[in-house]
């Protein structure tokens, strides 16, 4: 029995020493990693990066700033050209050049995409009775054809194509 007591006390002592060793091992590991990090640092500046380079504080301008800057640039060009044109009698009025930033663009020439009012898929067909767009014949047979008169106006209202009788 005395031998087992001694073993248990020895095991607790050895556990404490293991805990100390684990902490020492962690400290050794940190010291090792720090020494490796110090060895990896380059003592001279890289030839690929300028020594005077500063990271810009802001990368992109907001859309409002881009539009206002573009308008200022266009107005400056127009006033300069108008002053030159006032001296000549041939060109009295200058039209601004179309740019990507001009907000006053005409509507698109491309036709608007048409979607099914029921499913949201591409609407290839349009019902002749109530003007509801539908994707295929199955949707027409099951949903559009037996639709009640008030319900079709609700679908058209979602699209903004409803008509109100006064």
UniProtKB/Swiss-Prot annotation:
SMART domains: YL1_C. Residues 1-24 have a biased composition (Low complexity). It comes from the Eukaryota. The keyword Cell membrane does not apply. Residues 1-28 are annotated as: Disordered. Keywords: Nucleus, Transcription, Transcription regulation. It is found in: Nucleus. GO terms for cellular component: Ino80 complex; nucleus. One of its GO terms (biological process) is DNA repair. Belongs to the IES6 family. Component of the chromatin-remodeling INO80 complex, at least composed of ARP4, ARP5, ARP8, RVB1, RVB2, TAF14, NHP10, IES1, IES3, IES4, IES6, ACT1, IES2, IES5 and INO80. Probably involved in transcription regulation via its interaction with the INO80 complex, a chromatin remodeling complex. Also involved in the regulation of telomere length. Present with 1720 molecules/cell in log phase SD medium. This is Chromatin-remodeling complex subunit IES6. It comes from Saccharomyces cerevisiae (strain ATCC 204508 / S288c) (Baker's yeast).
